[in-house]
Every structure is written in structure tokens, then in C-alpha cells.
Amino acid sequence: MFSEVFELTRQNLERYQVDAQLHACRIQDYKDKPFDIIACNPPYFSTTNQNLMNVNQYKRAGRHEENLPLSELFTAVKRLLKSNGSFYLVHRASRYNELYQYASRVGMLPVKVTFAYDHVGGVAKTVLIEFQFATAHECMIEAPVYLDDRSTFPTIE
């Protein structure tokens, strides 16, 4: 963990008067009560090619899976999510099949999927997935989001 990042997070919570508990540890090591919701924007890139990894330690940790492989992420989520909870994950759309496989290995299925595109006619770059434990029978594919057109963004109610 980076103490500078932790401190910046603490300052932002204080600035915006958010009452929250912070824990500085790897999700793999976190040992507290289960959660109703887990939201995650994990590293997107696998670590198969060391030459492509960023040399900046902060960017490297945030972009490359060397400290949080998908298998470990989903194992931790299985342990930390309540049986009726939801796990929200944003990731590269091109890795959707891999995400689905890791989720199914821990007994989870996608219940809602939204693909995000840079522009109409482009290839999906990002996917937002809501996973739940395998009690769900259907998966809702939401309307696409185009990052260059805010009118396509879902509204928060």
C-alpha cells in the first residue's frame, strides 16, 4: 500500500465530510465482516509481458495485475460479500469472457452489464458488471453508454 495514496484518500473524505472507515491493506488480507456491496476498479492489464509494465510505481500498481490477479480478486469478493450482496466491477470490455469465468468459479453470475464506448460506431472499451451469487436467472444488458455523449449516461435516482 502507498501511504501517500492512503493519506490523500483520508483528506478527500474529510474535505467532503464523508463518514467512512479506511483500512490500508490488500483485499486479499482484509478480515472483517462481509459487505452488502463491493465496488471495484481493479488493475486492467495482465502481467504476462514485463516489458510493457509501467515504470511509475503508482501507475504500475493501478494498471497491472501483479498485486491483484483476477483470481485473487474474485476469491476475496466471495469471502467478503454477503450472500445477497452485489459486486460492481468496471473493467476492459475485451476481458469480459475472462471476468465471467472467474466469477462463475466462485459461484457468481452477472445480473447487469453495461458496455461503454468512446463514440457511436466504436468498439466497446469498458464494461460495468454487477455480479451476484448464482441465485440470479437473468442478466440485464443495459443500454450502451457513449463517453462522448453525456445524455447516454444513466441517471442516479
Where do the model's predicted regions map?
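Mobile active-site "lid"/loop adjacent to the S-adenosyl-L-methionine
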Residues: 42-72
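Conserved SAM/SAH cofactor-binding pocket of Class I
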Residues: 1-40, 46-52, 75
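Phosphate/oxyanion-binding loops and surfaces in catalytic or ligand/nucleic-acid-binding neighborhoods
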Residues: 45, 106, 134
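Hydrophobic alpha-helix-in-membranes signature
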Residues: 41-42, 109
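SAM/dcSAM-binding transferase cores
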Residues: 121-157
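Conserved Class I SAM-dependent methyltransferase catalytic core
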Residues: 66-124
